[in-house]
Amino acid sequence: MAAGVATWLPFARAAAVGWLPLAQQPLPPAPGVKASRGDEVLVVNVSGRRFETWKNTLDRYPDTLLGSSEKEFFYDADSGEYFFDRDPDMFRHVLNFYRTGRLHCPRQECIQAFDEELAFYGLVPELVGDCCLEEYRDRKKENAQRLAEDEEAEQTGDGPALPAGSSIRQRLWRAFENPHTSTAALVFYYVTGFFIAVSVIANVVETIPCRGPARRPPREQPCGDRFPLAFFCMDTACVLIFTGEYLLRLFAAPSRCRFLRSVMSLIDVVAILPYYIGLLVPKNEDVSGAFVTLRVFRVFRIFKFSRHSQGLRILGYTLKSCASELGFLLFSLTMAIIIFATVMFYAEKGTSKTNFTSIPAAFWYTIVTMTTLGYGDMVPSTIAGKIFGSICSLSGVLVIALPVPVIVSNFSRIYHQNQRADKRRAQQKVRLARIRLAKSGTTNAFLQYKQNGGLEDNGSGEEQALCVRNRSAFEQQHHHLLHCLEKTTCHEFTDELTFSEALGAVSLGGRTSRSTSVSSQPVGPSSLLSSCCPRRAKRRAIRLANSTASVSRGSMQELDTLAGLRRSPGPQSRSSLNAKPHDSLDLNCDSRDFVAAIISIPTPPANTPDESQPSSPGGGGRASSTLRNSRLGTPCLLPETVKISSL
């Protein structure tokens, strides 16, 4: 102990000597409790929506965007906020991850958009919680399959229309894979389908026995041997069609190596190869057996229908996606067959005249029993054999039934995916049709607007030859009223003055009638007069703003009388909204060729309420409504004039 003290005591004394000058000086003040910068509140603005959180909350994950110093690039010094131009609904789930440590996947959001948000904020998909992980993976897998199908559809020609400068290979491949693109492709589609059916039917019919010439006894032989020339010509025509189709597909394929390795390409080769081998091989007894074997492969032509049947394609995709389940089923059946065949052989070995002569011979009984077929050609006779046969039958039911739900679910999933793909293609066609219709409608509206005088020639500028004519709101309402009246009355109204000239020619003062019609005012020596029924009841007059005339309250929006020419026989349509121009002039001509229609415009009366009610100049209680036309020499009432009073 003493040695230990002697060892460290010199160091303690030296330290005390070194501290002595510092001890003579006053100690600094004790540090006060000061708020740490890590506890400050940060404001995060995501597309206008403000989120507030503690800085320590974001610092929990320094490897992410919000937890590292990289977020300072998004700091706005003026507002004191971190601004992100991202989806605020997605950010709510991201911020909850910083708070709780568990990342949840929103069901109502797109899974691809969610992955993009996670990648932006530096979060990996493995952080998704266990409660949402399975659904997240299923949705992501389904989205990946959909994108792969869309990409395959674009490559095979089911996608959008090809551009104008497409090559002949692209157009030909699109016609093969999507026959509905053109009439020629559809015709070729049905022709190949017809020859496939003819080839399969001929392959079946040529084996039917046919009777030859009348002999005693009658001799029967297959139809293929009875009529060899007819079946040979039929087979030759089918093979030529199949060969031409295969060569054209090989020429038009985007990737020839990939096409040669495809299943459908192998089916095409197997379907046409036996014919050419039969032409090259001599017909003798030595090679007749091999030739007959090759003729069996002609039955594979029936698989060519898979190009014409969506159900067969779905079945093929289902079997391909269930390869692991089918492999498990085959492995389980193989094990069960070997086990039960061995047991049945030794159980029936001691009996006489037994069919279970060997273990391979017992395979047939085991396969038939496990698949619940039960032909009855091999049956056990001992009690042990019957017991093990019953166990074999029950085991087969269980082994076969286990993978069936998985296969059915995959078939249903692929079927619904194809339905959604067909629906998307139909919606895309409808959308493109609507776009074309909208473009056509926009063009027609522009031409109609130009035809109606909405555009005027601007000769001063070279860049813009046509410009929009400036119209007042009252003038637009004037033409709108004309258009509505033409639709409701089936008459066409012609104008004799431009709208501005018609307004300038009508004077608001010097009224001699209580009528509210502009046409009842004298505007010239040769003008025709039109009036409505006189107003004999006294009304309170009001004064308009910026006007010296008073207007009765009942005549503010009243349209008294309207005269229009009846249309000539023909289509009840109007070529122009605001004009019926001369025959020698274009529709988009100068404004002097367009004149305003005679329409009763509400005009303030000049008399006071206390004055008497004079009659209209037309005389009588009801004045005749006429049409002003500058081309008529004298005032007259046209025989085809239509009068619409007090609309």
From Swiss-Prot:
The keyword Zinc applies. It is found in: Cell membrane. A motif (Selectivity filter) lies at residues 372-377. The chain crosses the membrane at residues 184-205, 231-252, 264-284, 288-308, 324-345, 387-415. One of its GO terms (biological process) is protein homooligomerization. Residues 1-183, 253-263, 309-323, 416-647 are cytoplasmic. Residues 360-371, 372-379 dip into the membrane without crossing it. The modification Phosphoserine is found at S555. The keyword Glycoprotein does not apply. Zn(2+) binds at H104, C131, C132. Residues 310-323 are annotated as: S4-S5 linker. One of its GO terms (cellular component) is postsynaptic membrane. Residues 206-230, 285-287, 346-359, 380-386 are extracellular. Pfam families: BTB_2, DUF3399, Ion_trans, Shal-type. Residues 510-520 have a biased composition (Low complexity). Signal peptide: none annotated. Residues 474-489 are annotated as: Required for dendritic targeting. Residues 144-164, 510-531, 564-584, 601-634 are annotated as: Disordered. It is a multi-pass membrane protein. A-type voltage-gated potassium channel that mediates transmembrane potassium transport in excitable membranes in the brain. Mediates A-type current I(SA) in suprachiasmatic nucleus (SCN) neurons. Exhibits a low-threshold A-type current with a hyperpolarized steady-state inactivation midpoint and the recovery process was steeply voltage-dependent, with recovery being markedly faster at more negative potentials. May regulates repetitive firing rates in the suprachiasmatic nucleus (SCN) neurons and circadian rhythms in neuronal excitability and behavior. Belongs to the potassium channel family. D (Shal) (TC 1.A.1.2) subfamily. Kv4.1/KCND1 sub-subfamily. The transmembrane segment S4 functions as a voltage-sensor and is characterized by a series of positively charged amino acids at every third position. Channel opening and closing is effected by a conformation change that affects the position and orientation of the voltage-sensor paddle formed by S3 and S4 within the membrane. A transmembrane electric field that is positive inside would push the positively charged S4 segment outwards, thereby opening the pore, while a field that is negative inside would pull the S4 segment inwards and close the pore. The zinc binding sites in the N-terminal domain are important for tetramerization and assembly of a functional channel complex. Most likely, the channel undergoes closed-state inactivation, where a subtle conformation change would render the protein less sensitive to activation. Component of heteromultimeric potassium channels. Identified in potassium channel complexes containing KCND1, KCND2, KCND3, KCNIP1, KCNIP2, KCNIP3, KCNIP4, DPP6 and DPP10. PANTHER family: POTASSIUM VOLTAGE-GATED CHANNEL SUBFAMILY D MEMBER 1, VOLTAGE-GATED POTASSIUM CHANNEL. This is A-type voltage-gated potassium channel KCND1. The gene is KCND1.
